[in-house]
Amino acid sequence: MIEALDEAIASWRTGRAEAADYDALVHRARRRFASLVAVPPDRVAVGNQVSTFTGLVAAALPDGARVLAAEEDFTSVLFPFLAHADRGVRVQTVPLDRLVESIRPGVSLVALSAVQSADGRLVPGGLDALASAAAAHGCLTYVDATQAVGWLPFDAGRFDFVSCAAYKWLVSPRGTAFGVVRPERLELLRPLFPGWYAGEDPWTSIYGAPLRLAKDARRLDISPAWLAWAGTVPALDLLEEVGIAAIHRHDLGLANKLRERLGLPRGDSAIVTVSADGGLERFRGGDIRASVRAGAVRLSFHLHNTESDVDAVARALGV
């Protein structure tokens, strides 16, 4: 990825960059992501962040709609819905372990992160149970898959709307993201940011009326930050080459080795959280990158990590 970015920046700096080359990269990234989440490419829109896609879904809800969400979920999942309070959109939050059982008649949409950003928790009972409960009650589903896609097998076709920022587990530059829409739900979403790149043929949609948007999810595309996409493509290529099943085994295996060292029960997440006592200083000597989220230290294991990293964390924690 770094080499691809360096090459793209060099081409840009020297004036050798061609717009059509970047366009090909975006199309390739769309296809790669579609493959990773098991949907056709025509269901995938490209963008730059999760909250943009959440905002499209929030704007599509009717006045007075009721949204069900998990307590303390990432705000890019919550804020866009809360911003519609002036037209009666209500957001009810419940503990994650009660989310599925709280889906009932009257809920317009359930919104959640597939994996919780703060502590790595997955919804109890699994996403299949959530999708089934929502379908049984005629409830739409919106899933932010940012903390899932790249290590956790994920079928985006189970949900009405999905978003995913690529800079986390897709190991891509910040500023690239994807949205997935079921074909039968596409008409619910008004393109709020339509520009030339959302056109049926972007290169003939640069000037003038009438409106001529793509017929598929590309109608929701946001004009891409080309250099960021130059780094996203090789990252997605690598993930597809290694395979999500193998990455899942690797990442979860390392996370559970750390849990075992810490005397914690085995888990189902590649994210491990430990007490924030002592802050991050105890990790700096071991060249360990960690974050403090929601009062705990968050540690994540991915394809570049090895058992030596587990040992380094254990030493830093004194176990």
Regions from the PLM with identified roles:
Residues 1-319:
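Pyridoxal 5′-phosphate
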